[in-house]
């Protein structure tokens, strides 16, 4: 079941609107984290994306090793 509740990025107001915040007109997002699964099928792709975007604070040699392991 998809979430109906959204939260404004600008003012933090909760709303049912899917497009924009009725209070300030800002963008809205789903405030809940994704469902957890121990058998995570997409973990490899999420880690690879974070590595390529530079969002994981790791050393360069570790990054190179992970990229080599994940792309093979």
Swiss-Prot record:
- Please give the GO cellular component terms listed in this UniProt entry: ribonucleoprotein complex
Q: Which intervals of the chain form a coiled coil?
A: none
Q: Molecular function terms in GO for this entry?
A: snoRNA binding
Single Gene Ontology BP annotation: pseudouridine synthesis
SUPFAM superfamilies the UniProt entry points to: Nop10-like SnoRNP
Key word Ribonucleoprotein present: yes
Give the keywords, sorted: Ribonucleoprotein, Ribosome biogenesis, rRNA processing
**TM spans (from-to):** none
Q: Extract the InterPro entries matched here.
A: H/ACA_rnp_Nop10, H/ACA_rnp_Nop10_sf, Nop10_arc-typ
One Pfam family named in its UniProt record: Nop10p
Its biological purpose: Involved in ribosome biogenesis; more specifically in 18S rRNA pseudouridylation and in cleavage of pre-rRNA.
Q: What is this protein called?
A: Ribosome biogenesis protein Nop10
The organism of origin for this protein: Pyrobaculum aerophilum (strain ATCC 51768 / DSM 7523 / JCM 9630 / CIP 104966 / NBRC 100827 / IM2)
Coding gene?
Answer: nop10
């Amino acid at each position: 079941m998809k979430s109906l509740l959204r939260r404004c990025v600008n003012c933090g107001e909760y709303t049912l609107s899917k497009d924009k915040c009725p209070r300030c007109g800002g963008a809205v997002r789903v405030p809940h984290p994704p469902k957890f699964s121990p058998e995570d099928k997409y973990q490899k792709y999420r880690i690879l994306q974070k590595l390529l975007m530079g969002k994981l604070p790791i050393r360069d040699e570790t990054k190179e090793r992970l990229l080599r392991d994940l792309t093979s």
